[in-house]
């Protein structure tokens, strides 16, 4: 009773008399306002009466009070007695169940009190007989029950008896005659009905049987629908409504026998009766078979069978078994066709559809599984017929093609049929709905298919052109969504079930091409991935398509492309998605299928090509496929195959590219660059723009010409017939605004690759992705530049500052995109000016061109200022920067040889055409005309380019004075030029690499003020390690091309004095005194002469060798790969020097051996380079032929420029450093180890060690010394004339016999001194005597060779300087090691000479040694500092490492082995003693320095100086790059501890470090000392120079 309290609260009952009664009456009045029985107020009213009565039963209220209030309420509602009787009925049941007798009594009292409100009849209907008896309404309940049963039996079960034998036959005969009469006259249904009534009454006919006869006659006379319908309506008004339905049901039941067939006339009668609502569908439906659950089971069985077929088709079965199974399947299907089950529900449905009763037909189909009804052909055709009728007026108006008559469809006469569609809006009413029920079974009616598609096409035209109101737009959008749904659910599935109908496919494309690609691809996606699973028939079709596709693909080859192509075309018309999905899966596995597949696709329809584009994108976007191979260093082959297929298929066939391009753009947005491979292939194939690093120099040269030359000579394959395909690509890009976004995304992604994609990926793969991104950008940008019109290009590409600052495009890419725009602008302005003033003079034309350049480039000059900090513009002007980035190779030079080559090819071609007798005359004429036209085009293009280049050069001549501002040093200017211009652009593309080299040459040729060509070239060649190491594979290739072009220029100047004098002699770029004041004029003395230039070129070659060897020995994949690529590119011009070439050859050979198993790609590169290097060996020359090496005059101040140790600071040649450059030199000292530029330090090239000052500067020598040395200088010159001594250089001199380095002493001063003293420490009395004699002989030698020119005070000063300088060098060396951070630094100073000793016969060697002895150490024309270092080093070696005379190798080995054993024993025994001796010697040595005579002081000082220099040299930037040796030496010295000083350890170390070189030991030295004793002092000198002379060889 929780709910009762809500309606009648207990408070009302408690205060009934006061307020409760009034409240209750008020409530009932409100609830009685709504008289409806369905409303909630009616239920609340019932509840209120129930609660009131319940309170009486509980005893809370008296029955009199309740009856009084109920009598008042009875006025509110007429149905009060009925409601009250219902309440009493419920209470009667409830109180009967209760055990409490009091409540039952209260209930009886209440009913009795209310008898005047409810009639007896109503109570007798509602209450139990027992209750009625207790109320006194009936006498006995039992009698009452019996009477009730009798009455019901009489009413419902007793039948009226008729006399069937006598009267009835005549009555029925008369009835049939009445119904069968001619109804065309004035006879009406009412008149007939009166006659029927008379017959029933007269003959006592059964009304049900009469009704049955009427239905039978109706079946036979369907043309009189209206008459019979009105007759039945009138007749049924006298019968029970259900009677008609039961009779019809009985008729249907009669035909439900096993072989029974329901007549169509019965279906039609039932349908008409349903349409006019004479019967109810629900009532009739239960009489029809089969039952709904049987239909559902049948549907499930069909799906299971379809899946079973799929499984069988996908199983691998032998062909014979397969054929047997197929035959059995066919037999089963035939059996099924013979015995179709009779489905009465479908029969009725067909009849309904035929008469146009869509509503009832829809209700029946809703009871069945989706498309179950339509899967029966008759039903499908009936729906199609109804749709034909409904869309007829609209189709006649908008769908009939021009010139077509068509066959009009007659409308249904039935007024209740669906209304015909007059407009697109009317289609929403019924037509779209009908199509949804039809589904894929529209395939039964291709004509209706075509009609719908044509209506859809007309709607899309109207939709796209419509500029109507907002309301209309909303309506049309609803129709569009309905049309898309119909396409998805009906048109495409129906196409799948049609038997390869190409016409339907083309018709459908007529509508599809009006959709945007997003709609189309969504539809294809649904079709491919969902539609085929929605219906059993489609499941079978999919399996059969795949089976057939497999059959075709297995047999597809290049030879049978045509027949296979036809089969593919036939299969694709109906099921393209399934077919292409399978074909693409095969292409991804077998890339050799690409060409035959592409050729076989020529029989497709337009729709199929579009579906193919979608399938390609879906295959590319497959998330389950890995885009990298398992090694994580290369892109997967499936992706490469798909990319290749894309390029080929999009080029050959007219396929819409928008979707593919948008997909690539979306991938780039998401930071994924793998799919750029697709774009690269598409642009390459469609536009003919090839991007490859393997271009020959001829191709590269052709690429610097005009468009015609590029097409003819710039690519590997002849690019033909790309006009249409490139136009399609351009249109796709412009129509969807993808041109600039793709460029910007690629430019941004290029740098993003490293950070977004480079995290966990292999460095090799990151490099490949970077290259792919960059190459595609270059290729794509090239396509846009050559294919977009000027207006299109300018409209889309923003200004340079916007590109860089707003879009964050890297500067090189931004200028690359803007460059064509500047060229277009300038040419259009120039044309305007030419037209405005028609002056034919060349000067006028040039002036106009320069004016147009200024107009176009002025805003660019302003824009570029924002790209860099203001400090940059102190070194180079914005004008120079913009000029460099805006020009191309086309602007700088005309490739005459390339034009000539192509013209000659055409001439040869024409001659071949003339000679060909088999060619038909017409074709001959055509081909010759083509060749002639092409030739004329090329010649015209060459002429045009020549004029253009002349104009550009004139412009540059005028601009050059404002290019370099000279606000800071030339060194800074060159740094900025290289950093902001040359290096970013030289690795951008192969043509840009050539451009950079040619631009540097052009700036030099223009005699540009403040530009040091020498410094620029020196900075480029001096240290390439860091640049090479930071390149990707393709960048390394381009950098190699750049170096190659730079070397080509340098080699041209180097090879001929006249060329050098002509092109460099008086040019400011070759000034050797570099000032920051802008003064470039100068004395002839300031210019670098030809011989010194050759020395500088040798230095550059040496630097390249050093860097190459360093990279090769790092073991790093990138270093090795890149340097091999660079070396391969510069092979035409480097190496030219024999010993450098041999050193490289050995290192590369080592790489070949090491990498053969580990890294096959490096092995292949190394082998390739090694082979090419060997073939170039015959062109290499000895070093003395490469640069002339005169021995320097003694004690003269030598003018030498830029040795291998030079740094990047400004320098002078032949004079002292200028004061205004000294500050620059100081600031650049930190760069001296990492960078090699042009640096000149004036030093004295003294012939004696004594003549060298400790800091390497000639300034410390006194004037006296110079004068005294002049005398010897004269003698030297006389000797020079007599004996043309072969000159040596520091680089070559430090090359050993077999290219392995000799160890250089790199210990701290203490160790070196200890070793010196130790060597002088005798082991026996004999040794002591030998040692003293040797010392004496050396003193004599030094006295003869060194004039005592310097005062004692100078000597003392030098003695004080020397140890401190050594300490500084030691510190410097340590700090350098720390900076390198574990990088292995070389031990020896340079490479060894590869010339073996045995090549020169003994007497000749002796003779050469004597010649060399007469000139103590020849000077190299590189830096004086380097010369001094070399002199000191050689003198140190003379003292420390005495070389024994040539011995046989076997003897040497024996002696070494014995000596090694002895020395090891001695070293163990005297280990402690040595330590003590070392300390004593150190003390003695310091005392001796104070006490020894001047001669000995000179010698010792020389030794110390040499060692210091030796150490200093090993850490200079020009050291030989053998990284492992130093670390080995260091480790050994640590492990040995106190054995360092012993000769045995030294000899052991020598043994390991210099493989193939002569090993030295104490035993050897003793022999040398004995021999030296016998020889004269000249002889001693001869031996001392033995080692260095060998190195020259």
From Swiss-Prot:
Keyword Nucleus, does the record have it?
A: yes
Q: Where is this region: Disordered?
A: 322-341, 1184-1593
- Report the outcome of residue 1549 to R: In MRXSK; uncertain significance
Span of the annotated motif Nuclear localization signal: 923-928
- Basic residues composition-biased segments: 1583-1593
Q: Which residues form a coiled coil?
A: 896-965
Residue span of region Charged domain: 1175-1593
Give the UniProt entry's GO cellular component terms: cytoplasm; nuclear speck; nucleoplasm; nucleus; THO complex; THO complex part of transcription export complex; transcription export complex
Annotated region Stern domain: where? 687-1174
Region MIF4G domain: start-end pairs: 535-686
Where found in the cell?
Nucleus; Nucleus speckle; Cytoplasm
Give, from the UniProt record, the effect of changing residue 881 to C.
Answer: In MRXSK; likely pathogenic; decreased protein abundance
Positions of region (Anchor domain): 1-163
Q: What is this protein called?
A: THO complex subunit 2
Species whose genome carries this gene: Homo sapiens (Human)
């Amino acid at each position: 009773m929780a709910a009762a309290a809500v309606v009648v609260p207990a408070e009302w009952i408690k205060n009934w008399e006061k307020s409760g009664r009034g409240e209750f009456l008020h409530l009932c009045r409100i609830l009685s306002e709504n008289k409806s029985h369905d409303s909630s107020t009616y239920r609340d009213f019932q509840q209120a009466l129930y609660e009131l009565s319940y309170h009486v039963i509980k005893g809370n209220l008296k029955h009199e009070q309740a009856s009084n209030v109920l009598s008042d309420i009875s006025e509110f509602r007429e149905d009060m007695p009925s409601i009250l009787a219902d309440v009493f009925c419920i209470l009667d049941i409830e109180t009967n169940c209760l055990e409490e007798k009091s409540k039952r009594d209260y209930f009886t009292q209440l009913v009795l009190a209310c008898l005047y409100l409810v009639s007896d009849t109503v109570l007798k209907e509602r209450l139990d007989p027992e209750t009625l008896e207790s109320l006194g309404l009936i006498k006995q309940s039992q009698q009452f029950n019996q009477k009730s049963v009798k009455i019901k039996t009489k009413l419902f079960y007793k039948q009226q008896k008729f006399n069937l034998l006598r009267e009835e036959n005549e009555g029925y005969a008369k009835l049939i005659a009445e119904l069968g009469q001619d109804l065309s006259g004035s006879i009406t249904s009412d008149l007939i009905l009166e006659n029927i009534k008379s017959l029933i009454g007269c003959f006592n006919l059964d009304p049900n049987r009469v009704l049955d006869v009427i239905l039978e006659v109706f079946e036979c006379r369907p043309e009189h629908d209206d008459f019979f319908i009105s007759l039945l309506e009138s007749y049924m008004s006298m019968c029970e409504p259900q009677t008609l339905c039961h009779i019809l049901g009985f008729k249907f039941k009669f035909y439900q026998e096993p072989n029974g067939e329901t007549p169509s006339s019965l279906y039609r009668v039932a349908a008409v009766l349903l349409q006019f609502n004479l019967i109810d569908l629900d009532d009739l439906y239960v009489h029809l078979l089969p039952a709904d659950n049987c239909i559902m089971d049948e549907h499930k069985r069909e799906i299971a069978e379809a899946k079973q077929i799929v499984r069988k088709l996908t199983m691998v079965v032998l062909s014979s078994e397969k054929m047997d199974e197929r035959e059995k399947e066919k037999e089963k299907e035939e059996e099924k066709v013979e015995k179709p089950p009779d489905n009465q529900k479908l029969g009725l449905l067909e009849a309904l559809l035929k008469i146009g009763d869509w509503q009832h037909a829809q209700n029946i189909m809703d009871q069945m599984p989706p498309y179950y009804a339509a899967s029966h052909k008759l039903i499908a055709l009936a729906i199609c017929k109804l749709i034909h009728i409904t869309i007829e007026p609209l189709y006649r108006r908008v769908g009939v093609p021009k010139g077509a008559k068509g066959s009009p469809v007659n409308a249904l006469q039935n007024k209740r049929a669906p209304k015909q569609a007059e407009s697109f809006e009317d289609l929403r009413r019924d037509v779209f709905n009908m199509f949804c029920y039809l589904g894929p079974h529209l395939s039964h009616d291709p004509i209706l298919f075509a009609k719908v598609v044509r209506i859809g096409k007309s709607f899309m035209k109207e939709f796209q052109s419509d500029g109507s109101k907002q309301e209309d737009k909303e309506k049309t959008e609803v129709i569009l969504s309905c049309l898309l749904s119909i396409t998805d659910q009906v048109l495409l599935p129906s196409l799948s079930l049609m038997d390869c109908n190409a016409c339907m496919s083309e018709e459908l494309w007529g509508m599809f091409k009006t959709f945007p690609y997003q709609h189309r691809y969504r539809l294809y996606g649904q079709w491919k991935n969902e539609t085929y699973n929605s219906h059993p028939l489609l499941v079978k079709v999919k399996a059969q398509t795949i089976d057939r596709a497999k059959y075709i693909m297995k047999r597809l080859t290049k030879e049978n492309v045509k027949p296979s192509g036809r089969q593919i075309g036939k299969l694709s018309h109906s099921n393209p998605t399934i077919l292409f999905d399978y074909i693409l899966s095969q292409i991804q596995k077998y890339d050799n299928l690409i060409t035959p597949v592409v050729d076989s696709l020529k029989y497709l329809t337009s729709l199929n090509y579009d579906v193919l584009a979608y399938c390609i994108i879906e295959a590319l976007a497959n998330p389950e496929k890995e885009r990298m191979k398992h090694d994580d260093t290369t892109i997967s082959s499936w992706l490469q195959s798909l990319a290749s297929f894309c390029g080929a298929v999009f080029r050959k066939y007219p396929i819409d590219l928008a979707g593919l391009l948008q997909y690539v753009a979306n991938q780039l947005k998401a930071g994924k660059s793998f799919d750029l491979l697709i774009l690269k292939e598409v642009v390459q194939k469609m536009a003919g723009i090839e991007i490859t690093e393997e271009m020959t120099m001829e191709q590269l040269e052709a690429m610097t010409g005009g468009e015609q030359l590029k097409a003819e000579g710039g690519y590997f394959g002849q690019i033909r017939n790309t006009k249409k395909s490139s136009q399609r690509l351009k249109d796709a890009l412009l129509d969807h605004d993808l041109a600039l976004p793709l460029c910007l995304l690629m430019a941004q992604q290029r740098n993003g690759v490293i950070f977004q994609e480079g995290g966990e990926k292999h460095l090799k793969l990151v490099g490949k992705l970077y290259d792919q991104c960059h190459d595609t950008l270059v290729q794509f940008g090239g396509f846009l530049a050559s294919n977009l019109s000027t207006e299109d290009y300018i409209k889309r590409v923003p200004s340079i500052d916007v590109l860089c600052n707003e879009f964050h495009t890297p500067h090189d890419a931004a200028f690359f995109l803007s460059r064509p725009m500047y060229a277009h602008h300038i040419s259009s302005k120039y044309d305007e000016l030419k037209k405005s003033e028609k002056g034919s003079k060349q000067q006028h034309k040039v002036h106009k061109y320069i004016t147009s350049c200024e107009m176009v480039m002025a805003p660019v000059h302003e824009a570029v200022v924002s790209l860099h900090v203001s400090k940059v513009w102190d070194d180079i002007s914005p004008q120079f920067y913009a000029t460099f980035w805006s020009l191309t190779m086309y602007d700088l030079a005309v490739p005459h040889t390339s034009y000539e080559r192509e013209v000659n090819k055409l001439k040869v071609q024409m001659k071949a055409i003339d000679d060909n007798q088999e060619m038909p005359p017409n074709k001959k004429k055509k081909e010759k005309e083509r060749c002639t036209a092409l030739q004329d085009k090329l010649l015209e293009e060459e002429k045009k380019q020549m004029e253009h280049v002349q104009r550009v050069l004139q412009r540059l001549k005028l601009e050059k004075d404002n290019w370099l501002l000279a606000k800071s040093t030339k060194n800074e200017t060159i740094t900025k030029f290289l950093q902001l211009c040359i290096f970013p652009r030289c690795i951008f593309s192969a043509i840009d690499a050539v451009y950079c080299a040619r631009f540097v040459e052009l700036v030099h040729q223009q005699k540009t003020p403040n530009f040091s060509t020498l410094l620029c070239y020196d900075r480029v060649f001096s240290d390439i390690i860091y640049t090479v190491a930071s390149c990707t594979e393709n960048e390394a290739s381009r950098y190699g091309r750049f170096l190659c072009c730079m070397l080509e220029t340098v080699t041209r100047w180097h090879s001929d004095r006249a060329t050098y004098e002509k092109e460099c002699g008086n040019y400011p770029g070759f000034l050797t005194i570099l000032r920051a004041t802008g003064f470039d004029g100068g004395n002839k003395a300031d210019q670098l002469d030809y011989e010194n230039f050759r020395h500088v070129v040798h230095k550059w070659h040496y630097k390249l060798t050093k860097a190459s060897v360093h990279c090769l020995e790092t073991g790093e994949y990138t270093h090795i790969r890149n340097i091999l690529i660079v070396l391969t590119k510069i092979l035409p011009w480097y190496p030219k020097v024999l010993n450098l070439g041999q050193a490289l050859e050995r290192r590369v050979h080592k790489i070949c051996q090491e990498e053969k198993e580990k890294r096959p790609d490096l092995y292949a590169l190394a082998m390739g380079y090694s082979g090419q290097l060997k073939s170039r060996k015959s062109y290499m020359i000895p070093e003395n032929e490469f640069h002339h090496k005169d021995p320097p005059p003694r004690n003269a101040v030598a003018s030498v420029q830029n040795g291998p140790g030079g740094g990047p600071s400004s320098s002078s040649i032949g004079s002292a450093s200028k004061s205004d450059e000294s500050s620059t030199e100081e600031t650049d000292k930190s760069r001296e180890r990492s960078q090699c530029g042009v640096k000149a330090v004036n030093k004295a090239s003294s012939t004696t060690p004594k003549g060298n000052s400790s800091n390497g500067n000639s300034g410390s020598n006194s004037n006296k010394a110079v004068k005294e040395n002049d005398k010897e200088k004269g003698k030297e010159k006389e000797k020079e004339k007599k004996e043309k001594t072969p000159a040596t250089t520091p680089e070559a001199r430090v090359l050993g016999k077999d290219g392995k380095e000799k160890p250089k002493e790199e210990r701290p001063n203490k160790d070196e001194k200890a070793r010196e003293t130790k060597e002088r420490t005798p082991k026996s009395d004999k040794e002591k005597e030998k040692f003293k004699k040797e010392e004496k002989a050396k003193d004599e030698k030094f006295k003869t060779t060194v004039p005592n020119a310097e005062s004692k005070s100078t000597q003392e000063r030098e003695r004080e300087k020397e140890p401190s300088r050594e300490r500084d060098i030691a510190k410097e060396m340590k700090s350098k090691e720390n900076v390198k951070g574990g990088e292995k630094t070389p031990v020896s100073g340079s490479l060894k000479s590869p010339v073996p000793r045995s090549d020169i016969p003994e007497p000749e060697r002796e003779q050469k040694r004597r010649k060399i002895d007469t000139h103590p150490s020849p000077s190299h024309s590189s830096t004086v500092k380097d010369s001094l270092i070399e002199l000191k080093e050689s003198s140190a070696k003379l003292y420390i490492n005495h070389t024994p005379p040539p011995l046989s190798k076997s003897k040497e080995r024996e002696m070494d082995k014995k000596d090694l054993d002895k020395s090891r024993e001695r070293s163990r025994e005297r280990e402690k003693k040595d330590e003590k001796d070392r300390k004593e010697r150190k003390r003695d040595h310091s005392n001796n320095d104070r006490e020894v005579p001047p001669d000995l002081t000179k010698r010792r000082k020389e030794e110390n100086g040499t060692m210091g220099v030796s150490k200093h040299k090993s850490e200079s930037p020009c050291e030989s790059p053998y990284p492992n040796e130093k670390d080995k030496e260091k480790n050994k010295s640590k492990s040995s501890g106190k054995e360092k000083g012993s000769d045995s350890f030294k000899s052991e170390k020598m043994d390991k470090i210099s493989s193939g070189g002569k090993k030295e030991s104490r035993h050897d030295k003793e022999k040398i000392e004995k021999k030296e004793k016998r020889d004269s002092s000249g002889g001693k000198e001869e031996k001392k120079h033995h080692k260095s002379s060998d190195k020259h060889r």
